[in-house]
Regions:
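Sec-exported extracytoplasmic/periplasmic mature domains
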Residues: 343-354, 456-457, 461, 497, ...
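Bacterial N-terminal signal peptides
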Residues: 1-7
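Sec/Tat signal peptide C-region and signal peptidase I cleavage site
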Residues: 8-12
Length: 842
C-alpha cells in the first residue's frame, strides 16, 4: 500500500530551463502554403480540417482518422513536464492496475531540420548559485539525452507546431512503456505493433493523458541452475504468455506540466518520516559535492493577508487547500467513510496552523468540468476489481518535492482483506467480527481507517513501523489509556488492530487513528517557518522542533526499511513482541475453535473455513517473525550532534534471550492448539504435520541467517555481556532437544523439528561461497553499502556449528541406551549417523 521511499529520477540545474537554440546554420521552421512531399510540412488548415477531432488543453490534441497529433505552443517549449506511466490493466501475475512503471521529467524543444525533440531531464546534479562559473561546469557534465524526435507537420501562425505522435505512443518507447526490468522479469520480447494501439487521448489545462494497449511476444525464461535457491526476482513467464505466446497490457501515460515557479524546499530530516527527493549540489565555495535531500509535500501556504494572524497563533485557511474528490463510481454507502478518512487529517493540519486544509468532496451531479484524469484534481478512484489492495501515490516535482496531485486507488475487494484482518485480530473481543459478512457500520469503520492511512501517504508520509513500539504492552489492555492515545501514535504504522486486548478488558475500539506522531509529522512538514531566507536557515529552526520531542517515544519515527531494529516492524503492536504475541496467541486459541460455527452457511462448502484457518496460521507466523527479529537486533536511532547517546545499539541481551525462550515455548514445543481436529478434518486430508514443520523450519532458518549471526558476533566483540552467537546455539539446542534430558518419547512433530535443526547445523559446516548481506538503510545518506557479512569460513559460524554438533552427538549417544520408544530410537539413530557423516566425512 505504499509508494517510493526515495525518488532520484535525475537532476539538472536549478535555474530555469531555456529553449535550446538551433545549431548554427539551422533554419527555423516556417509555415508554408506550398505543396509538400508526403510526410513533410503542410499548411495548417490543410492538416487540421473541419473533419479533425480536436481537444484543447496543455497540448491541443488532434485526431485525423487513426493519427494522433500534438499541437505544442511555443509558450510551453522548454517547460518541464513529468511523464508518469502506470499500468491500467494487467494480465494475471503482472501486478495491479495503478502501479507505476516509469517516471521521468521531460521538455519539448525545437531542433534543426524541422524537428521537435523530446528531451529527458535528469535531476542528478545541480548548482545552487546560477551566477557562478561552476554552473557551466555542471551543465557541461550533465547533457540531457534526446529521447525522441518528431517531424514538424504544420505551423500555426508562428505560435505553435504540430507533430504526429501516433507511432511514438504505439511503440515500445521506454518513457511510456514497461520498465526494462519489468520486461526482463516477465520474459517479454519485442512489441507486436499490429496488436498495439492508442486507445484514447485526453487533454486538460496542465496535463495530457494517453491510454495505450501494448502487446509483447512472450519468451521462455532462462533455465535455472540445478539446486539453485529460490529467487523471487528470477525471470518468469506469465500465464498469458505460456498459453498464447503473447502478453497484452494497458498502460496510461500522464504528461503533467511542472510549476513555472518552483516551491520552496524543506530539507529532509531522518527523524521525521517523509518521502524524499534529492540530488547532488555543486557549490562555488564548497570543497565537496553535497547531497541535497528534501521532503515531498504539498505547497500549502497562507494567504498574504493571513500571515500576521498565523504568526499570532490563529488558525487560517490555506491559499489552496488539499481537496480529494470521491470517484462517482464509488458505491453510495461507502462514500461518507472515505470522506471521513480524508478529513480525519484536519486536526493534524490544525496543529500546523491551518484550518480546513484538507477536504473531501463529491463531484456534483452533472458536472462535466471535473474529470478523474485532470491533474488539477486529486481523486479517490474506485475500481470494481477482485484485487485486495489500496494504494496512495502522488506525483511530485523532483526539483522541490512539491506534490502536484494524487490519485488514491481503492479496489472493491480490499474489503475482503479487511474482513480477514479484523476477524483474526479482533473477533476474540468484538462480536461484530464473528460472521461471514460484516454490517455496514463495521465495514465503514474499516474503510475509514484504510482511507486515512492511504491519505497519509499522499501527504508525503512514509510508514512509521516504529510507532507502535511507543505503547507499553499492558497499556494495550487499559481502556482509559486507549481512549486517550489509541494503541499506536501513528496510523502510518502497520499496527492494524489491537490484538493484545483480552475479552475481559472491556475494550471496544481496536482501531488506530490519526495520532500524536501523525499530527507532529504534519506540523513538521507543513507549518510555515517565517522570517528565514533559505532552506538551510529553516533547517535550523526545524531541528529545534525535533529536539523538543526527541526523548518522547510517541514522536519517534522508525523506518519501514530497517532489517534489524526490532522496534520497527510491520503488523506488530506494543513495546515487547514476546509479551504482545503471548496475548495474541491467547486470542487465536479463542478464535480457531469457533471458526466453523462463525462461517457455517446452508449449501456452502468449507472453502471459507479453510481460508480463515490459513489466516490464523499466517497471524501466528507473524508473531514468530516479530519475536525472531529481536535476536541479533540492533537499535537504530537517527541523531544529530546535539543529541546524547549512540545511534546504533544492540538489542538488550535479556530481550534476545527472552525471544529465544518464547520460540522454544510457543513454536518449537508443538503448538497443539493449531491442530484442532474438528477444523482440520473439514479442510485438509492430513493432520497438520507438514504445516507445523514449515512454520518451525522457516523460523529456525531465519534464526541462523548469516547476517543475523554476524551481528551477534559484532555485538559480542564490543560487549562481552551481549547475547552471543554461542548463547543462541545453546538456547536453541537445549530447547529443541529437551527430550534427551527428560527421556520422554519424541513425537512426530518434534522428530521433524529435530531433524530440521540438525540439518541446519550440518549445512552451516559448508556455507555458500558468498553469504547474503543484509540490507542497510542509513538515514543520513542514501545508497549506503550493505551491512557487512563476514565470509562464514573466516568467522566463528562454522566453529560453533561444529562444536554444537559434537555436543549434540554426545547427548544423543548418551540418551540412546535408555530410549525405549521405538520411533524415538530410530529417529535418534538416524540423526546420529547424519551428524557423524557430516563431522567425519570419508
Amino acid at each position: 500500500m505504499v509508494a517510493l521511499l526515495l525518488s532520484l529520477p535525475g537532476s539538472a540545474q536549478k535555474n530555469k530551463k531555456q529553449t535550446a537554440p538551433a545549431p548554427k546554420g539551422a533554419v527555423a521552421p516556417r509555415a508554408d502554403t506550398a505543396k509538400r512531399a508526403p510526410g513533410g510540412m503542410q499548411p495548417y488548415r490543410q492538416l487540421i480540417t473541419n473533419r479533425t477531432k480536436t481537444q484543447k488543453g496543455i497540448f491541443t490534441v488532434h485526431k485525423n482518422g487513426n493519427d494522433y497529433l500534438f499541437e505544442i505552443a511555443d509558450s510551453v517549449m522548454g517547460r518541464e513536464f513529468m511523464i508518469v506511466t502506470r499500468l491500467a490493466k494487467t494480465p494475471a501475475g503482472a501486478g495491479y492496475g495503478g502501479e507505476e512503471e516509469n517516471r521521468q521529467v521531460v521538455q519539448w524543444e525545437r531542433g534543426p531540420n524541422n524537428k521537435v525533440f523530446l528531451r529527458a531531464v535528469l535531476y542528478l546534479n545541480a548548482s545552487g548559485d546560477t551566477t557562478k562559473p561552476i554552473v557551466q561546469a555542471v551543465r557541461n557534465s550533465n547533457l540531457n539525452p534526446i529521447a525522441a524526435a518528431f517531424d514538424i507537420k504544420a505551423i500555426r501562425k508562428d505560435t505553435s507546431v504540430v507533430i504526429n505522435v501516433t507511432d511514438y505512443f504505439k511503440g515500445d518507447q521506454q518513457l511510456i512503456s514497461l520498465d526494462p526490468a519489468a520486461k526482463r522479469r516477465f520474459s517479454l520480447g519485442n512489441i507486436q505493433t499490429d496488436r498495439s494501439y492508442i486507445q484514447s487521448m485526453r487533454s486538460f489545462p496542465i496535463n495530457t493523458e494517453v491510454r495505450m494497449v501494448k502487446t509483447f511476444a512472450s519468451q521462455l525464461p532462462p533455465p535455472t541452475a540445478p539446486n539453485a535457491p529460490p529467487n523471487p526476482q528470477a525471470p518468469v513467464q506469465l500465464p498469458a504468455g505460456a498459453n498464447s505466446g503473447f502478453v497484452t497490457l494497458e498502460l496510461n501515460a500522464s504528461m503533467i506540466m511542472l510549476p513555472k515557479v518552483p516551491a520552496r524546499k524543506r530539507l529532509f530530516d531522518a527523524r521525521v518520516g517523509f518521502f524524499a527527493n534529492g540530488y547532488t549540489v555543486y557549490g562555488e565555495a564548497s570543497q565537496k559535492a553535497e547531497t541535497e535531500i528534501f521532503a515531498v509535500r504539498w505547497r500549502l501556504e497562507p494567504r498574504p493577508e493571513d500571515i500576521a494572524k498565523m504568526k499570532r497563533g490563529e488558525l487560517v485557511e490555506p491559499k489552496k487547500p488539499i481537496v480529494f474528490y470521491i470517484d462517482p463510481a464509488t458505491p453510495e454507502q461507502w462514500r461518507k467513510y472515505l470522506k471521513a478518512g480524508v478529513e480525519d487529517w484536519q486536526k493534524a493540519f490544525e496543529q500546523a496552523g491551518f484550518k480546513n486544509a484538507i477536504l473531501a468532496r463529491e463531484v456534483p451531479a452533472g458536472d462535466t468540468t471535473i474529470s478523474t484524469e485532470d491533474a488539477r484534481y486529486s481523486f479517490i478512484r474506485y475500481f470494481a476489481s477482485d484485487i485486495q489492495n489500496a494504494y496512495g501515490p502522488n506525483v511530485h516535482d523532483p526539483r522541490t518535492g512539491e506534490i502536484i496531485e494524487s490519485h488514491i486507488g481503492w479496489y472493491h475487494n480490499v474489503m475482503s482483506l479487511l474482513t480477514s484482518w479484523y476477524t483474526i485480530q479482533g473477533a476474540a473481543v468484538d462480536a461484530r467480527a464473528r460472521k461471514r459478512t460484516f454490517d455496514e457500520a463495521l465495514m465503514g469503520q474499516l474503510i475509514r481507517f484504510v482511507a486515512a492511512h492511504e491519505v497519509g501517504h499522499t501527504l508525503g508520509l512514509r510508514h512509521n513501523f516504529g510507532s507502535s513500539h511507543a505503547t507499553p504492552v499492558e497499556k494495550l489492555r487499559d481502556k482509559a489509556y486507549l481512549e486517550k492515545y489509541g494503541h499506536t501514535p501513528s496510523i502510518m504504522d502497520y499496527a492494524r488492530f489491537n490484538y493484545v486486548a483480552q475479552p475481559e478488558d472491556g475494550i471496544t475500539n481496536l482501531f488506530p487513528g490519526v495520532g500524536t506522531y501523525d499530527k507532529w509529522a504534519i506540523e513538521w512538514g507543513y507549518k510555515p517557518v517565517f522570517d528565514v531566507q533559505t532552506p538551510e536557515d529553516e533547517k535550523k529552526v526545524l531541528n529545534q522542533w525535533v529536539l523538543s520531542h526527541a526523548n518522547d517515544p510517541m514522536y519517534w519515527f522508525g523506518t519501514e526499511v530497517n532489517p534489524y531494529d526490532p522496534r520497527s516492524q510491520s503488523e506488530d503492536v506494543g513495546n515487547n513482541a514476546m509479551l504482545a504475541s503471548d496475548y495474541g496467541i491467547k486470542n487465536l486459541k479463542r478464535i480457531l475453535p469457533n471458526l466453523k460455527d462463525w462461517y457455517k452457511a446452508e449449501a456452502e462448502d468449507y472453502d471459507k473455513l479453510d481460508e480463515m484457518y490459513n489466516q490464523v496460521v499466517g497471524q501466528f507466523r507473524r508473531y514468530m517473525g516479530h519475536v525472531t527479529k529481536y535476536v541479533g537486533g540492533v537499535y537504530e536511532t537517527p541523531k544529530t550532534y546535539e543529541q546524547a547517546g549512540a545511534v546504533y545499539e544492540p538489542t538488550p541481551a535479556a530481550l534476545q534471550k527472552d525471544a529465544v525462550a518464547f520460540l522454544n515455548r510457543q513454536l518449537f514445543e508443538t503448538p497443539q492448539w493449531m491442530l484442532d481436529p474438528t477444523v482440520l478434518q473439514m479442510i485438509k486430508p492430513g493432520s497438520g504435520v507438514e504445516q507445523v514443520r514449515q512454520v518451525q523450519e522457516a523460523t529456525l532458518n531465519s534464526l541462523f541467517d548469516y547476517a543475523r549471526m554476524q551481528r551477534l558476533i559484532e555485538t559480542q566483540a564490543a560487549n562481552p555481556k551481549a547475547y552471543a552467537l554461542d548463547d543462541l546455539f545453546t538456547d536453541v539446542r537445549t530447547g529443541i532437544w529437551s527430550e534427551l534430558r527428560s527421556r520422554k518419547a519424541i513425537d512426530t512433530y518434534r522428530r521433524n523439528l529435530q531433524k530440521v535443526h540438525a540439518e541446519r547445523l550440518i549445512a552451516l559446516l559448508n556455507p555458500p561461497a558468498t553469504a547474503p548481506a543484509s540490507a542497510n538503510f542509513n538515514p543520513f545518506r542514501f545508497g549506503a553499502a550493505p551491512s557487512p557479512v563476514a565470509d562464514p569460513k573466516k568467522s566463528d559460524v562454522i566453529s560453533l556449528a561444529r562444536a554444537h554438533l559434537n555436543v549434540l552427538r554426545s547427548e544423543i549417544s548418551g540418551a540412546l541406551p535408555t530410549t525405549t520408544d521405538k520411533l524415538s530410537r530410530y529417529h535418534l539413530q538416524d540423526v546420529l549417523v547424519r551428524i557423524s557423516q557430516a563431522l567425519d566425512p570419508k
